[in-house]
């Protein structure tokens, strides 16, 4: 029995040594582009930036009702065991972005509210370390990945 206790104590100690996991939402958990293309009626990149954001902003509950990305439920089922954090950029072009993303998370995940970080894209780098230890960021945007 002492060996089992030792093993469990070692597992707890190693849990404390794990990096924080930060997961993005758009194009990682949620299919932002797919829904945006439905709303604007054409490929996202081919529609003018201002015009596409007007359409997104004018779509009721756009953010709260995004579909899961293919494979994202499987990813989430794995990472949610590790007190995962959300690190997602909000849109300055749509005031509904932050509250809508929070609604999506509440409806689709069990992420603790204190672990939800909706920030400006440039601020994501501030989450690279915690107390000098490197963290893990799951993100689709290459500029956010080292």
Model feature map: region roles:
Residues 29-33, 38, 84, 93-97, ...:
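Short catalytic/ligand-binding loop motif for oxyanion handling, primarily in non-cytosolic enzymes
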Residues 16-18, 81-83, 113, 132-134:
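A general structural motif
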Residues 116-146:
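Conserved Lys-Pro-Asp/Glu-containing loop-to-beta segment of HAD-superfamily phosphomonoesterases
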Residues 87-98, 102, 106-127:
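A short, structured active-site edge motif that brings together acidic residues
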Residues 47-48, 57-86, 94-99:
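Short, acidic loop-to-helix structural element flanking the phosphoryl-transfer center
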Residues 24, 87-89, 138:
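Short hydrophobic segments within beta-strands
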Residues 3-61:
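Active-site neighborhood of HAD-like aspartate-dependent phosphohydrolases
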